[in-house]
């Protein structure tokens, strides 16, 4: 019965969202004493080792073709992690999660710019709704440190979209494990100069435990997500993943007493509704 459940794309997408939300909570806890770039380094280094072992077990070899695009995907993914973890450390989990979930719209824009894909007219109206929702969350006219951190969270969606467009170019010729390996290996290297001046040696078993858990849990979430896409359409998986916002809000409320304000809730609703409508537009 468990095996049958694990063949449900929707359930796997929910599990992936839940697992990534756990990772986000662990990142927020670790960021109390460790810099975001350092967390990215350990998360990526541990993940690189684990995915390499999976590649060995599955007999997947590193190819010599398409390396430049693999590196682009890796850099985009690395910058996504740095921005997202930095945002998680400074703003509520729900806010960071909502902003990161804006990536589908940037995927549409990048696909039009770099892949020559046509943007349906309806998407322009949905984009306006998303921009309005983002402004309600970022609050650019409040001139507070929160707004700066929220902009960094928004940048995480931009870099995530860049990574997604690169994956679309790579997935036809490269195994998923290889794409993930390059992402994690490059992220490990990118994190080194970013953490160089602020590196803090983890001093307690608790800090080491958090870093190890982040690496393992994030890879587990990646496996769930990959399996979800193999058992269900990309549209259904993408829509289902918005439940991750609820999970993140739950952890934020439970452990850090984070309660989103009215503007954030309203902006989040606009973004989620617009993104679901976008998925239906793409499906149509």
From Swiss-Prot:
The chain crosses the membrane at residues 2-22, 34-54, 74-94, 96-116, 122-142, 147-167, 179-199, 209-229, 236-256, 259-279. Residues 8-138, 151-279 form the EamA domain. Keywords: Cell inner membrane, Cell membrane, Membrane, Repeat, Transmembrane, Transmembrane helix, Transport. Induction: Is part of the operon cntOLMI that is negatively regulated by zinc level through the Zur repressor, which leads to transcriptional activation of this operon under zinc depletion. Highly induced in response to airway mucus secretions (AMS) treatment. It comes from the Bacteria. Transports the metallophore pseudopaline, which is involved in the acquisition of nickel and zinc, and thus enables bacterial growth inside the host, where metal access is limited. Is probably involved in the export of pseudopaline. Essential for iron acquisition during the interaction with airway mucus secretions (AMS). Belongs to the EamA transporter family. This is Pseudopaline exporter CntI. The lineage of its organism: Bacteria, Pseudomonadati, Pseudomonadota, Gammaproteobacteria, Pseudomonadales. The gene is cntI.
